[in-house]
C-alpha cells in the first residue's frame, strides 16, 4: 500500500485531501497521518459521501489532527440498545425471517470540532460530539461527551484533566476569535500567538477591532 504521506514530520492540509462532501473543513487545519498511511477521508468512519441526509463532520480552522485519529459517524449505525436485541436485522432482509424488521437507525447530529483544536494520535470521537475551541484531546482517548473550550481531556472514556488557561484568559480568547483574523493580522500578532501572553494578544486585538 502506498503511503499517502511523505513524512511523519509534515501533515497535509485537510482542504487539499478531503473529498467527502459531508466533511466540512476550515483553513489551515491539517491531518498528520504518516503512521497509518491513509488520507483524512478514511478517518471519518461510516460517513456516506453520496448522501446529503446524513450527519456531517465539521472541523474548524487551525486544527491539528494526529495519525490514526477517527471520527465515528452514521449515528447508532442501526443498533438500538434499548430494544430487546441490538442486532441490525433490518439490514439483512434478504433472510426471510428478518423481512418484517424495523429500521433501527437514528442520527446523532453533526460532529463539530471547533477552531484551534489539537487531537492526538489514535483518539476516537464518538457520533454527535461537540469539541470546543482550543481543546486538546489526548492520544488514544475515547471522547464520548462534549468537550468545553480550552479543556485538556484524556483517557477511556475521556475526562477533563485541566484547563489550558484561567477562565478570564479563556473568555478573552473566545472574544477575540483569532482564527478568523486575516493573515496580515495573524502575521503581526505571531510573537504573541507563540507565547502565553493572552492579555497582550487581547490588547493587540482591541487596537484593530475598534
From Swiss-Prot:
Give the EC number(s) listed in the UniProt record. 2.3.1.28
Q: Which UniProt keywords apply?
A: Acyltransferase, Antibiotic resistance, Plasmid, Repeat, Transferase
Q: Give any single GO term for biological process.
A: response to antibiotic
Reaction(s) catalysed by this chain's protein: chloramphenicol + acetyl-CoA = chloramphenicol 3-acetate + CoA
Cited CDD domains? LbH_XAT
Tell me which InterPro entries the record gives: Hexapep, Hexapep_transf_CS, Trans_hexapeptide_repeat, Trimer_LpxA-like_sf
Q: PROSITE patterns from the entry? A: HEXAPEP_TRANSFERASES (PS00101)
Q: Please explain the role this protein plays, according to its UniProt record.
A: This enzyme is an effector of chloramphenicol resistance in bacteria.
What family, per the record?
Belongs to the transferase hexapeptide repeat family.
Q: What is this protein called?
A: Chloramphenicol acetyltransferase
Task: Give the organism the record lists.
Answer: Klebsiella aerogenes
Highest classification ranks of the organism: Bacteria, Pseudomonadati, Pseudomonadota, Gammaproteobacteria, Enterobacterales
Amino acid at each position: 500500500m502506498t503511503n499517502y504521506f511523505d513524512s511523519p514530520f509534515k501533515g497535509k492540509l485537510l482542504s487539499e485531501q478531503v473529498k467527502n462532501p459531508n466533511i466540512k473543513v476550515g483553513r489551515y487545519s491539517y491531518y498528520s497521518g504518516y503512521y497509518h498511511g491513509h488520507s483524512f477521508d478514511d478517518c471519518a468512519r461510516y460517513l456516506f459521501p453520496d448522501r446529503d441526509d446524513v450527519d456531517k463532520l465539521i472541523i474548524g480552522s487551525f486544527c491539528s489532527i494526529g495519525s490514526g485519529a477517527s471520527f465515528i459517524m452514521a449515528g447508532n449505525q442501526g443498533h438500538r440498545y434499548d430494544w430487546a436485541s441490538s442486532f441490525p436485522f433490518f439490514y439483512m432482509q434478504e433472510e426471510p425471517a428478518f423481512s418484517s424488521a424495523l429500521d433501527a437507525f437514528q442520527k446523532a447530529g453533526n460532529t463539530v470540532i471547533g477552531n484551534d483544536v489539537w487531537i492526538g494520535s489514535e483518539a476516537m470521537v464518538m457520533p454527535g460530539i461537540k469539541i470546543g475551541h482550543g481543546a486538546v484531546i489526548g492520544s488514544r482517548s475515547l471522547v464520548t461527551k462534549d468537550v468545553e473550550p480550552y479543556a485538556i481531556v484524556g483517557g477511556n472514556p475521556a475526562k477533563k484533566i485541566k484547563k489550558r488557561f484561567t477562565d478570564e484568559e479563556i473568555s478573552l480568547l473566545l472574544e477575540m476569535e483569532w482564527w478568523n483574523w486575516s493573515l496580515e493580522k495573524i502575521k503581526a500578532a505571531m510573537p504573541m500567538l507563540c507565547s502565553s501572553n493572552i492579555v497582550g494578544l487581547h490588547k493587540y486585538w482591541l487596537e484593530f477591532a475598534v
